[in-house]
Amino acid sequence: MRLTDIEIEQALDNGSIVIEPRPSNDAISGVSVDVRLGGQFRVFKDHTAPFIDLSGPSTEVQAALDRVMSEIIEIPDGEAFFLHPGELALAVTYESVTLPADIVGWLDGRSSLARLGLMVHVTAHRIDPGWQGKIVLEFYNSGKLPLALRPRMTIGALNFERLSGPVARPYNKRKNAKYKDQQDAVASRISQD
């Protein structure tokens, strides 16, 4: 069952869900908590690589990713990152989230942003039980105009679902967890599969 606003506030109060900085009660509605955009981004650089062979040897996949992904781009508060039509960018939430082993989170984009062509997560919207860290956002502009994204703007909402019991392998305990404790706009680590 999805947690209600009352249950979300109780989980924040008792520390079973931790969101830092803690959201105001105005950011909690019905079944969700608003999250804001952080100031870190990554984009695909201009490159001459014709493709990335995702099934190739892991060293070759990683080398290709290193060639095409930018370093972290820091956008100060008050300034904007421009996402042009047809572009993909990675970013992070301003908030850091910690979930217990018996709660899964779900990230939803905002309808108002989707109506302008902004996809906030291309596919990955589940936040695993045991997650700890910032949430990477996979932006795609499917619209016709560049979109100005500013740090700390409301970018999406998290909702939470209590499981029938704690999972045996929470994310923060898995040895092969590729994005454990992430604080940055981490590029794909598919080469570690």
Swiss-Prot record:
Return the protein name: dCTP deaminase
Q: Write down the top EC class of this protein.
A: hydrolase
Gene this protein is translated from: dcd
Q: Which GO terms describe its molecular function?
A: dCTP deaminase activity; nucleotide binding
Q: What does this protein do?
A: Catalyzes the deamination of dCTP to dUTP.
Q: Does this entry carry the keyword Lipoprotein?
A: no
So which domain of life are we looking at? Bacteria
GO BP of this protein: dUMP biosynthetic process; dUTP biosynthetic process; nucleobase-containing small molecule interconversion
Supply the source organism for this entry.
Shewanella sp. (strain ANA-3)
